[in-house]
UniProtKB/Swiss-Prot annotation:
UniProt source species: Escherichia coli O9:H4 (strain HS)
Keywords of this entry: Cell inner membrane, Cell membrane, Membrane, Transmembrane, Transmembrane helix
InterPro entries listed in its UniProt record: Multi_antbiot-R_MarC
Cytoplasmic side: 29-44, 90-118, 176-196
One Gene Ontology cellular component annotation held by this UniProt entry: plasma membrane
Gene assigned in the entry: marC
Periplasmic face of the membrane: 1-7, 66-68, 140-154, 218-221
Family named by the database record: Belongs to the UPF0056 (MarC) family.
PANTHER family attached to this UniProt entry: UPF0056 INNER MEMBRANE PROTEIN MARC, UPF0056 MEMBRANE PROTEIN YHCE
Protein name, entry field: UPF0056 inner membrane protein MarC
Length: 221
């Protein structure tokens, strides 16, 4: 049971900086201004469900995609590392606010014409929370843990759905209490946390690339 808690904790530490619910909160506040409370709550719940579904598909179908297209694990690690590092650099040195992103702009225009427009899948679930970096990390981690003997088989079977469920619950709670979070942390606080998470992502991305290169050297040496 202790191994299960360790696996869940490790999964959350890896995924939460990538998912970064606080930036999704800022985006949600910008897009949901014209919605009533019931509609905001519904969009929050749907976004969380979509995030859970995307992560589950990435974890369980990722290996099939790799086999179909002939993608090796070192190649995936290097590609995933580049994506994660790029996202980290963008969080460290943001060029545009979340509300100014193309996805947010198109949704803002929809909301002006249609108050009940859906923002749960795009941009809240994808790409804000479960974006390319998150998906690459999940697929790469799935390939890695299946080859490792760190955790028992039952832990590797039970932990991933629980990790994805907890990420979805954290996102749901953050979106439901978005107003309170923004008042408590403030815009500057969210930016500071985003930059800190960006630095962590750059470090994780570089380590991914190093691991991929070392595995290539070990394979072909």
């Amino acid at each position: 049971m202790l191994d299960l808690f360790k696996a869940i904790g490790l999964g959350l530490v890896v995924l939460l900086p990538l998912a970064n619910p606080l930036t999704t909160v800022a985006l949600f506040l910008g897009l949901a201004g014209n919605m009533n409370s019931a509609e905001r709550n519904r969009q929050s719940l749907m976004a969380s469900v979509y995030v859970f579904a995307i992560m589950m598909v990435a974890y369980y179908a990722g290996q099939l995609v790799m086999d179909t297209f002939g993608i090796s694990i070192p190649g995936l690690r290097i590609a995933g590392g580049l994506i994660v590092a790029f996202i980290g650099f963008r969080m460290l040195f943001p060029q545009q606010k979340a509300i100014d992103s193309p996805e947010a702009k198109s949704k803002s225009e929809e909301l002006e014409d249609e108050p009940s427009a859906h923002i749960a899948f795009v941009p809240l679930a994808m790409p804000s929370t479960a974006g390319p970096g998150t998906i690459a990390m999940i697929i790469s981690s799935a390939s890695t843990v299946r080859q490792s003997s760190t955790f028992a088989d039952w832990v590797l079977m039970v932990a991933p759905p629980l990790i994805f469920f907890l990420v979805a619950v954290i996102l749901w709670g953050s979106l439901r209490s978005s107003g309170a979070i923004m008042r408590l942390v403030g815009k500057g606080g969210i930016e500071a946390i985003s930059r800190l998470m960006g630095f962590l992502l750059v470090c994780m991305g570089v380590q991914f690339i190093i691991n991929g290169i070392l595995e290539i050297i070990k394979t072909y040496h």
